[in-house]
Amino acid sequence: ILAAKLIKDQGIEVIGICFKSYFFNEENAKRMCKQIDMPLEVVDFSEEHFEMVKDPKHGRGKNMNPCIDCHAMMMRYSGELLKKFDADFIITGEVLNQRPMSQNRQALNTVKKESGFSEKILRPLCALNLEPTEMELNGLVDREKLLKISGRSRKTQMELAEKWNIVDYPSPAGGCKLTEPGYAIRLSDLLDNQETVAKDEIEVLKYGRHMRISPKNKVIVARNGEEWKEIVKFKKEDDILVTSKNSTGAPVILRGEFNKEDLETAARICGRYCKEKDSDAVEINYEKNGEI
């Protein structure tokens, strides 16, 4: 948003591009664009993005986040939109060395190269640390009005936000679930144990505890009533619902191929999290397709 404002202040029309996937959405972008009166185009690249997440060419960060491959994909999609909007170039808010893996000089160059639009990418916030682009050399953009931010500190960015009265902006991670350790563990487990994964199976990872009983099955346990309202939306026809007969404790979903031993394990997990957990015994119900 700061990069967009910087270019807008040169009298250049700017259109926001936001990407939507299984792991992040457009809500932050919508709020930010309103603050600088910038139109927004939302691009849903969920399927292609997910295929990349499974096997990123340039590896991952601390968790499941393939930032270099992700940025390159975003730049490619943005480049393909240039003609649609009769636009001249792409700007991004990247800052040299702000992130050790994905925003070092080599990574920034990799993103440009693999995007297929390397000559059309401008990084206004750190442009003075980089070689001039064709947009600067031909006078389309005034290089002297661009910035030289580098490093991990966000002090300069926060000062700019205050100066421009931009008060609603996201945390540095930007709302990407792939950067969250707990979510990353659940996604990694899913990919390690299933050859094919459906959208609903990815969505439900955002909620509850996911416990692998065997390579062929797992249980999902809600932490509270609000989580259960979300989890139950993704319940499959073949799932087993495991509940305590005499309490309103946490329901458990058993998913996958299972045997009697797995059912008993799911029952013990249900007993562990229900309100009767301190009792000598907990009576358990198994429900499938509405039948107990």
Explain the meaning of each model-derived region.
Residues 118-292:
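AMP-forming adenylation/ATP pyrophosphatase catalytic core
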Residues 1-163:
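ATP-dependent adenylation/nucleotidyltransferase module used to activate substrates
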